[in-house]
């Protein structure tokens, strides 16, 4: 196995940023498919990690960086949601307490490990086994890192997924928000809700007095990113309304759309999956979107090529 964090040196090494005293963000470039951010909180005798990485190799590199900061063991792992880029590496942590919202555990078990499906470029996942949360909560849970409170909060409704959890450090004013925010990348709502994400960001996330936000992908940011992401989601809803009125499917609506200010965001093909979800949000009688059909449409939008994945 390569000792590097990844097999794509052009991406550059992950950045370790101390966003507050004893609180670190681990930022993996370039934040595209399956290249996520994690973070950790250093206590006197133990460490709390927020999320794992997508591959064995990346997760081991992350654990090495934690060990470079403190000899204290990682005893607790919090999953912000069930997606594999944040949870596949759970098993690499060994026998520790894994915490997630109750639907996070259920979705991890139901979804399993992805493998190489042809939707994305092939990935060397490493030796992985499914490791869902061993402790679950419904709405809120408070952890302690020494004398530092760490508050877990389910956002209350589907947004990025059905089980998004905020990790808020009130004394440090640091928020880990998982994939509710992407910084420089296109948000992805196929397994959540576009309308729900707008409501969560505006009524749950925005009121939190965060001085620093570690998003699920991209650079550490401030609260200004919330409005930027909400603007994109409202743009998606407007395209969906037009598509439904014209009777065109999501792929055609996406192909007819000029992305404008969002064209430079990474993974722009997500507009297709987002429209599949937005159609269902606006017309609930459609039920849930067909995930494989939506992902296949994203490949079609990408010129028939598998989606770029350099995890």
What are these regions (language model features)?
Residues 22, 41, 51, 66, ...:
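Divalent metal-coordination and catalytic microenvironments
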Residues 15-65, 165-178:
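Conserved beta-strand hairpin/beta-sheet module of binuclear metal-dependent hydrolase folds
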């Amino acid at each position: 196995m390569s000792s590097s964090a990844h097999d794509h040196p052009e991406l550059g090494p992950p950045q370790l940023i101390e966003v507050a005293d004893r609180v670190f963000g681990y930022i993996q470039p370039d934040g595209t498919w399956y290249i996520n951010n994690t973070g950790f909180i250093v206590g006197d005798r133990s460490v709390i990690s927020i999320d794992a990485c997508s591959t064995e190799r990346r997760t081991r590199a992350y654990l090495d960086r934690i060990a470079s900061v403190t000899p204290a063991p990682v005893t607790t792992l919090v999953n912000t949601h069930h997606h594999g880029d944040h949870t596949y590496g759970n098993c690499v942590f060994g026998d520790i307490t894994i915490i997630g919202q109750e639907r996070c555990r259920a979705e991890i078990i139901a979804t399993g490990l992805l493998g190489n499906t042809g939707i994305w470029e092939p990935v060397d996942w490493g030796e992985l086994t499914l490791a869902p949360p061993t402790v679950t909560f419904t709405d809120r849970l408070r952890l302690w890192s020494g004398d530092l409170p760490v508050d877990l909060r389910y956002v209350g409704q589907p947004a990025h997924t059905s089980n998004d959890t905020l990790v808020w450090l009130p004394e440090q004013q640091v928020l880990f928000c998982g994939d509710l925010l992407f910084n420089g990348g296109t948000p992805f709502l196929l397994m959540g809700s576009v309308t729900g994400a707008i409501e969560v960001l505006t009524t749950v996330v925005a009121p939190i007095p965060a001085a620093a936000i570690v998003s699920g992908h991209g650079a550490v940011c401030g609260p200004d990113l919330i409005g930027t992401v909400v603007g994109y989601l409202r743009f998606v809803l407007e395209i969906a309304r037009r598509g439904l009125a014209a009777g065109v499917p999501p792929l055609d609506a996406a192909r007819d759309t000029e992305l404008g200010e969002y064209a430079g965001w990474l993974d722009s093909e997500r507009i297709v999956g987002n429209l599949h979800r937005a159609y269902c949000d606006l017309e609930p009688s459609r039920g849930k979107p067909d995930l494989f059909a939506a992902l296949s449409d994203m490949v079609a939008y990408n010129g028939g090529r598998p989606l770029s994945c350099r995890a």
